[in-house]
UniProtKB/Swiss-Prot annotation:
Keywords: Cytoplasm, Lipopolysaccharide biosynthesis, Nucleotidyltransferase, Transferase. Belongs to the KdsB family. Disulfide bonds: none annotated. It is an enzyme of class 2 (transferase). Its EC number is 2.7.7.38. Activates KDO (a required 8-carbon sugar) for incorporation into bacterial lipopolysaccharide in Gram-negative bacteria. This is 3-deoxy-manno-octulosonate cytidylyltransferase. The keyword Transmembrane does not apply.
Length: 250
């Protein structure tokens, strides 16, 4: 089975313009993401809509493909990139361009989901720990996931799901395992073509979570598990946290 990694990277981010080109420990954020992915998948490309990002990727020796500025989601950008790249890839892996510390173990966990021939789409979760403050669970920028017994996603929400009616909130993390969604997706190539042709759904628009479009249309999302904490960079403040993490790790 052949896996193609695509890293969507936009220049015009609302909260952090030029984020992929921000420097982190002497390298751009997009270079760090690319280097984490290279070698784990059969091939990897950055998919961008900006010539500055294209030039930066070529400068460090990475592969890059130009895509439209009109895409509403990273999945749409992945599909255009996939059609331009070509090849006989079975699965396309969508790696967030703002996750410079994505780990090989996480990519391998998503790949393992496709050992099940019925898997259409796969993603990752990380369990919240019982000692985390309740505010972490309440964070609307950290979507939660509920799963069925077969490790398929039932629903994703920015709200806390499930709501424990008969327990104090301070005890929720002790009485139930909550899962944080990690925004790493993989799709069988033919499924990627299908889901990008779907119109936006009511649940997707309500939560601003594109994966709800797929669930609402009957697609199954297989979930792999990771114990690695991710550090996404959405704001300049997040970049400072990433710099501290990098210093402490070295």
């Amino acid at each position: 089975m052949k896996f193609l990694g695509i890293i969507p990277a936009r220049y015009a981010s609302t909260r952090f313009p030029a984020k992929p080109l921000a420097m982190l420990g002497g390298k751009t954020v997009i270079q760090r993401v690319y280097e984490q992915v290279a070698g784990i998948l059969d091939d990897a490309y950055v998919a961008t809509d900006d010539e500055r990002i294209e030039a930066a990727v070529k400068a460090f020796g990475g592969k890059v493909v130009m895509t439209s500025i009109d895409h509403k989601s990273g999945t749409d950008r992945c599909y255009e990139a996939c059609t331009k790249i070509g090849g006989d890839f079975d699965v396309v892996v969508n790696i967030q361009g703002d996750e410079p510390f994505i780990q090989p173990s996480q990519l391998n966990a998503v790949k393992a989901c496709f050992e099940d021939p019925t898997t259409q789409i796969a993603t990752l979760v990380k369990p919240f720990t019982a000692d985390e403050p309740f505010a972490v669970l309440e964070n609307v920028n950290s979507p939660k996931v509920v799963l069925n017994k077969n490790w398929n996603a039932l629903y994703f929400s920015r709200s806390i799901i499930p709501f424990q009616r008969n327990a104090d909130k301070e005890d929720w993390l002790k009485g139930h395992t909550y899962y944080k969604h990690i925004g790493l997706y993989a799709y069988r190539t033919e499924v990627l073509k299908e889901i990008t042709a779907l119109p936006q759904s009511s649940l997707e628009l309500a939560e601003s979570l594109e994966q709800l479009r797929w669930l609402e249309n009957g697609y199954k999302i297989k979930v792999g598990i990771s114990d690695v904490e991710t550090i996404g960079i959405d704001t300049p403040q997040d970049l400072k946290h990433a710099e501290e993490f990098l210093k402490n790790r070295s």
